[in-house]
Amino acid sequence: MRLKSILFATMLLLCGLSFTACDNSDPDEQKLSPIETPSYTMDAAKYEITDASSAYKAVELTEAGRYIIVMKGATPSNTDSDDLYITGHFSKNNNVYVLQGLGELTITKAGNSYSLLLNVNGRQVQLPATKVTPIPSGQATDYLCRTWRFIKMHIVVKYDGQTVFDGTSSSSAELSNALRKAIDRFEKSDKLKNTKEVQLGLAEEEFPKTITFTHAGTYFIAYKDPKENILNYWNWLNVEEKLIGFSEEKVDLSSKSAITADFTNNQLILSETEKERNETIITTVTLNQDK
């Protein structure tokens, strides 16, 4: 099991395990603490390019000030090459978006359509586009749609109700080593099949740096190595229960690819509970708003 599947196992469709949410609170009674509004909330939007001959497929500006440009013919979930999409931070100078490391972007509205003028190293490209209909604004949506910085992962492993491991770390290597030692100490270690997969996943990959959700239905996971970055789709399966569906295709969201979000003390908490026979693994990821 890869580390990405530990963080969002169903989201990435890398394993066919079943997960259950840990948040059973009444959403009407759960009060979200005030949280700072992302700097570019009013500018956030995704534009899909309508020119079939263009090399560009989509341009998105996120609430937290990141631009994501997807090239035509690229599969957003494919991270084997860093030329499939271009991403970085942006700022705004009057009506011009300054794209760090790339150039400038000017957006002009014309009726129901848009014209994007992209200036890259002095070369201008005119891109006709339509604006993606955003996920409706609401308390949970607006809270979620921002960039979150990974803080820590907490893993609890139980077998027949007995706690085998209970540990937390911001380091995947540290958590992997501690989990491996716990497995070795357990008298029925041969029964911990899924736990061993988790331990190997932690040993093979680092934790991500940040996770970004946008109103346009994009989620972006950034790693230290940009080639490991993930760019896919999300939407609410049930906004009242804060149940999120994930997919490599925006039309293929299902309850099999879902996780429940919880907001506590200005943090995003994502929890998964994997149960198979006598083995239970509870994984909780804590993220803070990225400044």
Residue locations for each model-derived region?
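C-terminal motif of bacterial Sec signal peptides marking the signal peptidase cleavage site
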Residues: 17-21
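Sec-dependent N-terminal signal peptides
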Residues: 6-11
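Positively charged n-region of N-terminal signal peptides that target proteins for export
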Residues: 1-5
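Lipid interaction determinants
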Residues: 24-85, 93-233, 237-291
